[in-house]
Amino acid sequence: MSMEFDAVIIGGGVSGCATFYTLSEYSSLKRVAIVEKCSKLAQISSSAKANSQTIHDGSIETNYTPEKAKKVRLSAYKTRQYALNKGLQNKAIFETQKMAIGVGDEECEFMKKRYESFKEIFVGLEEFDKQTIKELEPNVILGASGIDRHESIIGHGFRKDWSTMNYAKLSENFVEEALKLKPNNQVFLNFKVKKIEKRNDTYALISEDAEEVYAKFVLVNAGSYALPLAQSMGYGLDLGCLPVAGSFYFVPDLLKGKVYTVQNPKLPFAAVHGDPDAIIKGKTRIGPTALAMPKLERNKCWLKGISLELLKMDLNKDVFKIAFDLMSDKEIRNYVLKNMVFELPVIGKREFLKDAQKIIPSLSLEDLEYAHGFGEVRPQVLDKTKRKLELGEKKICTHKGITFNMTPSPGATSCLQNALVDSQEIVAYLGESFELERFYKDLSPEELES
């Protein structure tokens, strides 16, 4: 078996698998490979246990500006359209209602203004008053005594929407389709990249077991591990990484659909939301929490897996200055401390209950169950030159046949849009072709028309 490929993707999560499919379906490349360190695809951030299983299209994510929502909507619709085209309904993609709610006069005023801006972007977006919310999500309104909550409450959303995705199942489908299209493609599991070497016009990917795979172009879609790999080759030395781990709590099956809350614009992390779980029937997931930890990947034991690569990246005065500036802000400091408390036994559950009751006011302590084994680390990039936290996705383009992607949420939602960008870069570098019109025709006819 030849170990030489036109392009090799490091990382078998949904982003890497989406690019594997996109190159196989729409480009003239002959051979593409994925190398993945785990024994199966999509076992870390793309696992159904690691994320909220949401297609983040911007309609109920209250931290999105209208401009960002327009872009994210098109990205999300590509991923949704692919799943529907491939018949993945009720296998990978699920239909449910969804809404964002504002609680209290200040948040209600914000939601009213937001609706006026967003109804033009999302056709069919509906405003919900308190009575309508009670009809759609009775447990959002009913208190423990069976009496309606006293706060003013308003929301908007969709009564029915393809809003839930099992990204692990989607990843598997991407790869199955790619292998049908190009039988010479390969997937290498249990291949943890130790080193990447440039050898003339080819890159050698060397595993911890001394196996070697060769590529004319390397795309690193390895989540938290992307930046350490980049820095091992001398790229991205001006960057650091703040790994933030999210945790969830289970409650009984009390929500009919997704319920999101208003996010504090000063905080770079999602506000608490409720999601009926797609893989564990009869459970609703509430979260996430957000806890910074010195690990590139979450493990059951807190001390297990502390990353030496991360310590090497972050043990310098610039990173400490960024951390100090963040913690100097009272709201951010209180948020960080509160989320540290959420992880503590007994007291954490009691404190988290207060946040969860914003969504389901009748919740009791007995209803909450810490979701062990759920949640994962998201790499937040630190710019050591600007001394600031960089929000969103980060890309290091070397223009030398290797690109590094760091894709925190909503990277899974945008996987096909990101795959399009990366695929176009790869084919341009290799002098190959890409069927852009057919890509849009299949996945985003709206963009083709415009």
UniProtKB/Swiss-Prot annotation:
It holds the Pfam family Mqo. SUPFAM superfamilies: FAD/NAD(P)-binding domain (SSF51905). Its cofactor is FAD. GO terms for molecular function: 2-hydroxyglutarate dehydrogenase activity; L-malate dehydrogenase (quinone) activity. It is an enzyme of class 1 (oxidoreductase). GO terms for cellular component: cytoplasm. Its EC number is 1.1.5.4. GO terms for biological process: tricarboxylic acid cycle. Keywords: FAD, Flavoprotein, Oxidoreductase, Tricarboxylic acid cycle. It catalyses: (S)-malate + a quinone = a quinol + oxaloacetate. Pathway: Carbohydrate metabolism; tricarboxylic acid cycle; oxaloacetate from (S)-malate (quinone route): step 1/1. Belongs to the MQO family. This is Probable malate:quinone oxidoreductase.
